Design a protein with these regions (language model features):
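N-terminal secretory signal peptides that target proteins for export/translocation
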Residues: 1-9
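N-terminal accessory/pre-domain segments preceding catalytic cores
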Residues: 4, 13-177, 294-401
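Short, well-ordered strand-loop elements centered on a beta-strand within folded domains, enriched
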Residues: 140, 144, 208, 212, ...
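Secondary-structure boundary elements
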Residues: 151-209
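Short helix/strand-bridging catalytic loops that position acidic/His residues to coordinate divalent metals
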Residues: 207-213, 238-241
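Secondary-structure capping and boundary motifs in well-ordered enzyme cores
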Residues: 212-216, 220
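Hydrophobic/aromatic-rich core segments of domains that either
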Residues: 219-294
Length: 401
């Protein structure tokens, strides 16, 4: 890299590397399956740890840029928003040695993460380098250069494949779908078309999902965000940890003005199998809906947030999958159970999943359906054996039909 000095004198250079892969994420899902220095002159210090913004913008342009950027951008101070735009523009236009408005390395790292959280389409960035320019022991400026996983020709080729996937996916979305239907459709589509694979290349970005059809949680979450944004639904990336302390990624979405969490990875049966959840053979629900549009309280049972920026408290259950689909029990109700089983048989479903509002209702359901074996009243199983799974943390249980 070219060394630049403000004045003649001795210079020193130190190199290192910061990659974006700070989230090598797996996660753990609990589910049970059962049968019944200083220099005399200028010093430039370089470490490895995006188009230049116009000198001025009109108020309308500022608003437009803010609308085009995401959730994290909107929750930064004005100073950090300026830094955010400098970093974002440098990354998307492949600019080098861009002078930043901040000389705080921790702030630069934080805002860099905000940019990546808001922009899953910047899939080709794997880190950045910064250069410190000092006069004596006084830091004068920092410049920024992105580090890229692919060259621009490769990026264009991959983007074509990504566009093909997105067009195929969205072409099958129901016409006039409301936001809940869009979220549910994309959740299901990604699960049906993706296998959990910690060994696949590019598993921290959307290429693994859209090109390889295999990924880990950050790939799932960024793909979910990308598709929902393309479909006109707000979605952003959320980082945190799950049971066991492993890094994890999922999404925050907005439906009818209310925020919900979505974890597409934990909804995928292939993750449940790889995660060692105890399912034998093929006895795994194809899709686990426990993590489709859930409130903060429910998510906190298994997930812990790393607040890159402040996140809202999700309190609504209106767009929760089980509520919208009629599988949610606020009290033990035999008629509701009978209706659900009957309708799912009529639809040819492979299994039924029931979810309860509380541990108390869950225990009532468990006592009736399992302990007293009343589930056989609703099942067509002449052999007298039923396979089921339960998730005590989420107060849900599934029965195979």
């Amino acid at each position: 890299m070219v060394c630049c000095l403000l004045r003649e004198g001795v210079h020193m250079k130190r190199t290192g590397l910061l990659l974006t892969g700070m989230l090598i994420v797996t996660g753990c899902l609990t589910y049970a399956w059962r049968t019944l220095p200083r220099q005399e002159s200028d010093l430039y210090l370089q470490e490895n740890v995006g188009a230049k913004q116009e000198e001025s913008e009109s108020a309308e342009q500022v608003v437009q840029r803010e609308q085009e950027d995401g959730y994290a951008y909107g929750r930064l101070s004005e100073e950090k928003q300026e830094l955010y735009l400098e970093i974002r523009d440098a990354l998307v236009q492949f600019d080098e040695d861009v002078k930043l408005s901040s000389c705080d390395k921790e702030e630069i790292s934080h805002v860099f993460q905000c940019v990546l959280n808001d922009h899953p389409e910047i899939f080709y960035v794997e880190g950045y380098t910064y250069t410190e320019y000092t006069l004596g022991d006084i830091l004068k400026k920092i410049t920024f250069t992105g580090s890229y996983r692919f060259d621009q020709e490769e990026i264009a080729e991959k983007q074509k494949l990504i566009d093909d996937y997105v067009n195929q996916c969205l072409s099958g979305m129901p016409e006039n779908a409301d936001d809940y239907t869009k979220v549910k459709y994309i959740y299901e589509y990604l699960i049906h078309h993706t296998e959990y694979d910690a060994e696949v290349e590019d598993n921290q970005n959307i290429c693994s999902v859209f090109i390889e059809g295999r990924s880990v949680c950050q790939g799932y979450a960024k793909a979910t965000q990308y598709l929902l944004n393309k479909a006109g639904v707000f979605a952003t990336l959320v980082l945190g940890r799950v049971v066991g302390g492993e890094g994890h990624a999922w999404n925050l979405v907005q439906i009818d003005g209310q925020y919900y969490y979505v974890d597409t990875t934990w909804g995928d049966a292939s993750y449940q199998a790889v995660g060692g959840t105890g399912y034998p053979g093929e006895k795994i629900p194809t899709i686990n809906y426990d993590y489709l549009c859930v409130p903060t309280a429910q998510m906190n049972l298994t997930h812990t947030l790393d607040n890159v920026v402040e996140l809202p408290e999700c309190n609504s259950m209106e767009a929760n999958y089980y509520v919208r689909e009629g599988f949610y029990f606020t009290e033990w109700n035999e008629e509701q159970v009978e209706r659900i089983f009957r309708e799912e048989y009529e639809k040819g479903s492979a299994y039924v999943t029931l979810k309860c509002v509380s541990d108390g209702v869950y225990r009532q359901m468990q006592e009736a359906l399992i302990d007293r074996q009343e589930v056989f009243r609703y099942l067509d199983c002449p052999e007298g054996v039923v396979s089921y799974s339960d998730n005590e943390e989420q107060y849900s249980m599934s029965f195979w039909l």
